[in-house]
Amino acid sequence: MTGPVIQGWCPGALRPMMSGDGLVVRVRPRNNSLTAAQAEGLAAAASRHGNGYLSLSNRANINIRGVKPETHPDLIADLDAETEARRNILVNPIRAHFFDDADSHPNVALADALADALAAADAPRLPGKFGFVVDLDRGLRELAHDVGDIRIESADTGWKDFILRADGMPTGRLVTRETAAGLAIEMARWFVDSGGVGADGRGRMRDHIARGARPPAGLSGDVAPARPAIPPKPGPRGGGTLVAFAFGQVRAEKFAWLAKAGGSIQITPWRMIYFSSGYKVRRELMFDRDFITSSDDPLLRVVACTGAPGCPQACRETRMFARQIAPWVPRGATAHISGCAKGCAHPGKADFALTATPEGYRGARNATAAEAAAAEAAIALDPHDLETWLNHTAAPEKA
């Protein structure tokens, strides 16, 4: 079996990636936020130039799939894409309510300053997947489990304290609103100058640290980050509402409606959307099958990539299979259905990993997609084997 092709870059708006159903164009909203007008425009672009769906990524980006090469220039004309390739900043989506003005919240202010610095002519040239995290709220870290190479995050010394921390280091140095962005750029420049970027143009901070690199004294410290927040689930949170979608995919018209209902929306790295909502809107969401508003929905227990035929590297269809498996996955567990060994939808281990191969699905417990594909004990699966393999004897729940 030929191994999957590992790309060192993500399909940004100006540099799309070809897939089985056309180009994949990734949009990085500034501060992971969209006004109602911006969301409606993006939805219209997805309907006009793509397949009519918007896919949410685990980097709080939005993918438009099915774009024809000949219409890609028209899509770019509809987007403000000139600087998005250099803006890879993940922002805490939950607004803290002890700040009077959301626009003056330190998450927004610091992310804006960081984006401006990255757009400067003298900014360091970073690998395509290299990213920043801005995670400041209430002495907690909403993004503690989300990937980021350079992190500006709440400290454990007090709810107003922030630290700058290189991913892979257990502690960081205290920073302020005024100094954080500049020091983050200095850390990025140190990463490049100290050999963090390989000959192939790739590089991640955690790997650099694991190889023995250490930030200089001015970019390191002994302050620990704040404790992680409770893992996010669909439903009310922080004065707003988190809404999920099966496999992180939402129809364009529903995306636009959600933004209009909330006034604006935050794209999260949890493949959910966060927005302000009243009781009437939440009630409408509950009765619309396009939205997932309950944390008990079985579809939240499965993760699946695009699969075949949308992805040329996938050996088989994935999402219909994931819908079949969802009712049998035990509560509290996660099943990862991957079209190939790359495991794009869920890079880490899952309680149940099922990976498509030319011979069929192969599975392993507490494994990555690659481990499931390669494990000696992996077994060929079809939908009729799932109940036994998952060791879940209760009647399936309605998905």
Question: Where do the PLM segments sit?
Answer:
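Cofactor-/ligand-binding subdomain signature composed of acidic, glycine-rich
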Residues: 235-237
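Short, low-complexity, intrinsically disordered N-terminal peptides in bacterial proteins
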Residues: 1-8, 391-399
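An acidic, glycine-/histidine-flanked metal-binding catalytic module
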Residues: 153-229, 266-267, 360-362, 371-374, ...
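Intrinsically disordered, low-complexity polar/charged tails and linkers
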Residues: 1-16, 230-231
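Residues that cap or delimit alpha-helices
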Residues: 68, 210-214, 382
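Short Fe-S-cluster ligation motifs
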Residues: 336-349, 363-396
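Small-residue-enriched alpha-helical segments and adjacent helix-cap loops
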Residues: 2-3, 19-165, 170, 174, ...
